[in-house]
Structures are given as structure tokens and as C-alpha cells.
């Protein structure tokens, strides 16, 4: 019986050899998205010309899993597994991941050890969130018995916060900053940031075997961040996607680096990963240069004695040795990201607050504010959510007027104001360049976009990633040539390389910067003055950001 099956398999393969697809379009015409090869359970890729006659082609067969479609990954209405009973042990996976015809990961072995805390890092758009979704969907042979939870931040439910989070989640909600009054609010009435906190509370309360956290630090203040760092240490296995270096350093013990279709595993936290990767890259570069030198010497010998009869045999030997050597490929260098803010020169005080009070209705938000913003100020404002930090920035930017007191602005003042919600509400179907040309000439628009690494002539705003939208926001304000940058949570959605580029650009900027941020690494690298917003006032903190965090006593 087995010989018959074997014969049928080989007959099938011989037929397949005679029918290579020359293009994806040809495969589509015959209604084929992939061809399953019986004896390997593999999938023949049809994105490029392919034939089973080619040894290289046969190696391209994708073995463990069929392609994963993004729409299928996001079809679940809940982030929690309710039909699983628990799982003891480690996961040993081989990961192949495709989305909409694009290869994300190729045959990458990955072991997830029970009880470990992992950081998943990589550039924007490389597939980190897609990988988390695939794990949530139990691709790669993940057992049904394993309870997996992944927060779906876009899921809005019609119930109170405490009902949504669970009966035992009271202390968790408190740790994340919820008051008793907020805990009885409907989820639909919360801002995106507070909804995310409620999802975090539910996830932690569920105590899954594997918790998947995608950018959990966005919109959390430093108090909540400190609390979450401590709580993660008590959980079971966790995989975290975050661009907050300090948070990853304090929560993770292994780093998964998604890069070049691979998952490289590093022991230690993020800081340790950076050192190890730097050493690995330097070692690869030295090995490449050494091999290049060997080949150059051999080629030089061949060229010199090619027509020397006495050395003919030695030359032929060198030629054969050189031909047998594998193709030498230079180690890939990470592209350098550079941001540039232009400015309008200014000197002295740009803005002065004199006994400023601001109220919403009958409730005073800020009061008694008296301070100056000078042309070289580098100010970061920190404090718990809901204390009035964003309101203060809007007063600076002229988006709000003082209820009492006065705000004196220099005649030369030009403000560039960045807030994430402005970017999120742009028209998704509008072309990026057309949008920029509403305010600038085409040359100015292109220059502003290029200053932040954007070349998106034919792209609509809706197709941009979160990080690209933030860059678009920077490009918009850069076209104004401001001398005061007012930035509300500018690092949300940026990858680490872009955060570094932003910090460096602010360091070179010839003007003042006032920013609200909770990213401790970004604050340390970009700002000299720390102000605390609490109890309706804003006061100077004389110390660094780590001293401020330590003083919270969380």
C-alpha cells in the first residue's frame, strides 16, 4: 500500500515539474494561491516564478503553516481564551509567517520558556504585532490547553469598568490609577488611554498562561508604569512589545529581535541586548573584512602569475579554491534615521505666564501659574494623568485662553504644536503630499517630509503606520519653522531608532521645547528641566527623572 502511495506522490510531483507558474498573476488566473505538497505538508510559494525542477525552488517550500491573512487574525471579538484549561511546560515552535503575500518570518525556531518575561523588538512595520496576533490565533502548533490573552485595544464594550475587568480586579484598577468613581463608568465613556488601562486590568486579573502585551506603556503616566513594572514580575509568561527602553529594562529577561525574516534570541534585558547585538555586528563585520582580504590576496596572486608557466598549477589551484568559496555577503547595516527641525531665530523670553488660571466650567484645572519659556528652554512636564498637563500645553500653543491672568507672547513667537489625536483625525483617504500642499508649496512640502524620512508621494494617510503618522505630524509643524516646539506624548508609536532620532533632532533644534512625556529614556536624553503638574499647579523639580520616579514610592 505504501509503495502505491509513494508512486502517486512521485507522479504528482512530476506533473508539477511540468507546470511552473511564471507569475503571481498566472497563479491567480487558475484560482491557486498556493500548492500543498503532500509528502512535506508544505506550501509552494507562488509570489515569484517557481519550478519543482529547481533544487533551490524545492527549498523554498514553506513547511509548518499556511499563510496567515491579516483579516483572519483580527476576526476575533475578544482577547481572552475561555475554553482553555491551562498548560504546563515550554513551547517549542518553528515560525513561518506570511500576511497578504508578504513574508514576515521564515522558518524561525523559537522556544518560549514558562515563567520568562520576553521583550519583542524590531523596527516599525516589521511584523511584531502580526506575530503576537498569530500566537494568539494558535498558529505554529500551539496547544489548545494553553490560556493566551492578548489585549484588543480597539474593542469597546457596553459595561462598566469594574464589570469588564472582573470581580477580583479592584486592586489592579487602583494600581492603574482608577478612582472608585471611574471604576463604575461605562467603558464607552472612557478615553482611549483609560480604556487601555481597563484592558490591562482585565488581562492581569485573568492570569493567563501566556500574556501578550502590545505597547502597554502608551498613555500610562509614570506612576502607572512603575506599578505595572512590579506587577509583570508576578505574572506567568509574558511577551511585551514596547518602545520604552526603561520599561523593557525593568520587566524583561529575554529579548526577541525580529529582523531580516528571523527571530534572534538574546539573554538579558534591553540594555544587555543592545550591547550583545553591537558586539555581534562588529564581529560579523570583522569576519567579513578578513574573508574579503583573503580573497583579494588570492585574486592578486592569480592576476599576477596567470601567464607564468612555472606557477600554472598553483594558479589553477587558487582559481579552483576561489570558485569553491561561498558568495561573500556584507553584513547588513541598520539604516541611519535622522530627523531635522528647522527654526526661526529668537532670543529672550518667548512666552510668560503671569498668575494664569484655567477652568473648565466651574472646575479649576490649573491656577497660579507664573513662569517663563525662554528661547533655549528644554522643559518636560510630568505627573499623573488628568492633572492638566495637556491643558498646559494647549495654553502654550494658543489653543486655549486663560480664564484669569495673562499670557504674554513675544512678537517673533512661532509655535509648532504636536498632539497625537490631531494626527489620528486626519482624513484617511487623502494623499499625503496633497495634504501637505494645502499649507506649503510642493518644494516646501517635499522638504518637510524628507526631514523626517518620509517619501510617500502616492500614499494615502490611512495607509501610514502609527510611526509614519507621527513623522507626518512632525513634518507638518516643521514647515512652520517654529521657534517653540510644544509636543504632547511625541514618542507614542515611534520605534526606538526614531525616538533616538527625535531626541537628537531636539538637541540640535535652535529654539525652545516644552514636552509632555512618560518615556524615561527619552526624557533623560532630551530635557534639562523637569516640571511636575499636580494639584492644579506646575512646579520645578530639581533632580533627574529617575530621582523623580524613585520619589513616587510606587
Swiss-Prot record:
This is Probable ATP-binding cassette sub-family F member 3 homolog. PANTHER family: ATP-BINDING CASSETTE SUB-FAMILY F MEMBER 1 (PTHR19211:SF14), ATP-BINDING TRANSPORT PROTEIN-RELATED (PTHR19211). One of its GO terms (molecular function) is ATP binding. Keywords: ATP-binding, Nucleotide-binding, Repeat. Gene3D superfamilies: P-loop containing nucleotide triphosphate hydrolases (3.40.50.300). It holds the Pfam family ABC_tran_Xtn. It comes from Encephalitozoon cuniculi (strain GB-M1) (Microsporidian parasite). Belongs to the ABC transporter superfamily. ABCF family. EF3 subfamily. SUPFAM superfamilies: P-loop containing nucleoside triphosphate hydrolases. Residues 89-285, 351-554 form the ABC transporter domain.
